[in-house]
UniProtKB/Swiss-Prot annotation:
PANTHER family: ATP SYNTHASE SUBUNIT B, ATP SYNTHASE SUBUNIT B', CHLOROPLASTIC. F(1)F(0) ATP synthase produces ATP from ADP in the presence of a proton or sodium gradient. F-type ATPases consist of two structural domains, F(1) containing the extramembraneous catalytic core and F(0) containing the membrane proton channel, linked together by a central stalk and a peripheral stalk. During catalysis, ATP synthesis in the catalytic domain of F(1) is coupled via a rotary mechanism of the central stalk subunits to proton translocation. The lineage of its organism: Bacteria, Pseudomonadati, Pseudomonadota, Gammaproteobacteria, Pseudomonadales. NCBIfam families: ATP_synt_b, PRK05759.1-2. The keyword ATP-binding does not apply. This is ATP synthase subunit b. F-type ATPases have 2 components, F(1) - the catalytic core - and F(0) - the membrane proton channel. F(1) has five subunits: alpha(3), beta(3), gamma(1), delta(1), epsilon(1). F(0) has three main subunits: a(1), b(2) and c(10-14). The alpha and beta chains form an alternating ring which encloses part of the gamma chain. F(1) is attached to F(0) by a central stalk formed by the gamma and epsilon chains, while a peripheral stalk is formed by the delta and b chains. One of its GO terms (molecular function) is proton-transporting ATPase activity, rotational mechanism.
């Protein structure tokens, strides 16, 4: 193989081309590659952060849902207790009212019974005096009559 001027000229031209590429072409290509690599890394980091944020949000939503269910159960339990308390209060009030009505009715019955007894005593006294008048054939004066009726009523 002969080394001639053409081969040396081509080698020098190639060396100039390589130096030109290293000086002017290679730095922007490397910069573009680094920029692209950085964008990809940032995108992966953002995706990772988004996945963590999503996981945290789901966990937080689950916790809030559990808290809401617990709070709802507590509210329902309080409502049941309050409902039972209202029913018990109503039953107690009804019992007290029934006792009051019963006592009042017994008092009215006792009063009516005493009134009927007094009327009956008066009628029995009048009948007794009337019967005694007929038997004796004489009339007793009104004062004695009233005194006799009262005495008989007291005895009866």
């Amino acid at each position: 193989m002969n080394i001639n001027a053409t081969l040396i000229g081509q080698s020098v031209a190639f060396l100039i081309f390589v130096l030109f590429c290293m000086k002017f072409v290679w730095p922007p290509v490397i910069a573009a590659l680094h920029e692209r690599q950085k964008k990809i890394a940032d995108g992966l980091d953002a995706a990772s952060r988004a996945a963590r944020d999503l996981e945290l949000a789901q966990e937080k939503a689950g916790q809030q849902l559990r808290e809401a269910k617990a709070q709802a159960a507590e509210i329902i339990e309080q409502a049941k207790k309050r409902g039972n308390q209202i029913v018990e209060e109503a039953v107690e009030k009804a019992r007290i009212d029934a006792d009051r009505v019963k006592v009042q009715a017994q008092a009215e019955i006792e009063q009516e019974l005493n009134s009927v007894k007094d009327k009956l005593r008066a009628q029995v006294g009048l009948l007794a005096v009337g019967g005694a008048e007929k038997i004796l054939g004489a009339t007793i004066d009104q004062n004695a009559h009233a005194e006799l009726v009262n005495q008989l009523a007291a005895e009866i």
